[in-house]
Amino acid sequence: MVNKLEQELTQKLEILLKQTALSISDQQKNKLVQLVLLLNKWNKAYNLTSVRDPMEMLIKHILDSVVVSPYLQGDLFIDVGTGPGLPGLPLAIINPDKNFVLLDSLGKRISFIRNAVRELELSNVVPVLSRVEEYIPDHKFDGILSRAFAILKDMTDWCHHLPNEKGLFYALKGVYQQEEVMDMSNNFQVIDVIKLHVPELIGERHLVKVKKM
């Protein structure tokens, strides 16, 4: 039986998605709503996010993650400092043909992600409990995703060992600061800065794509 909150989230998600160019199946929409419900439930006990309102989670966590989807190139991605699986889990839900490693150093976050993977039957997600500098992957990645790093230099310094030859860094950021680029090592180059439209989100959002030279 669908409860009132689930119904409201489903309706709200439909409204939000209509303001984007994303094409998402009904099953995927349902999984995104279930993810919000799970996050809301776990958050009460484990304090996984400062966002308390499920409707707000839909905008600040789900939509903010999925709008990046059209820009992803490749099949194998790692979300570094994923927290409660953001942007990795929403992206995995709407990209069943791509594989995602979700990395975080905090046990309660990885426990939540493992639970979400099980509940939502996500066969394309591997949760990993580790600090990024200690993580040695079996395969290098097509894309390194993160919304956890305050500055680009930190992301490229900490994650330099993760991309494959053609792999890219995808930094999800608020306001784009040109100064950040100046601070980066010469081994890295910004190849694109995309202004993202996240429906009903106050403030700027950007996707910064970086490649290793």
Swiss-Prot record:
S-adenosyl-L-methionine binds at G81, L86, V132, E133, R147. It is found in: Cytoplasm. GO terms for cellular component: cytosol. The lineage of its organism: Bacteria, Pseudomonadati, Pseudomonadota, Gammaproteobacteria, Pasteurellales. This is Ribosomal RNA small subunit methyltransferase G. Its EC number is 2.1.1.170. It holds the Pfam family GidB. InterPro entries: rRNA_ssu_MeTfrase_G, SAM-dependent_MTases_sf. It comes from the Bacteria. Gene3D superfamilies: Vaccinia Virus protein VP39. Specifically methylates the N7 position of guanine in position 527 of 16S rRNA. Keywords: Cytoplasm, Methyltransferase, rRNA processing, S-adenosyl-L-methionine, Transferase. Belongs to the methyltransferase superfamily. RNA methyltransferase RsmG family. It comes from Mannheimia succiniciproducens (strain KCTC 0769BP / MBEL55E). GO terms for molecular function: rRNA (guanine-N7-)-methyltransferase activity. It catalyses: guanosine(527) in 16S rRNA + S-adenosyl-L-methionine = N(7)-methylguanosine(527) in 16S rRNA + S-adenosyl-L-homocysteine.
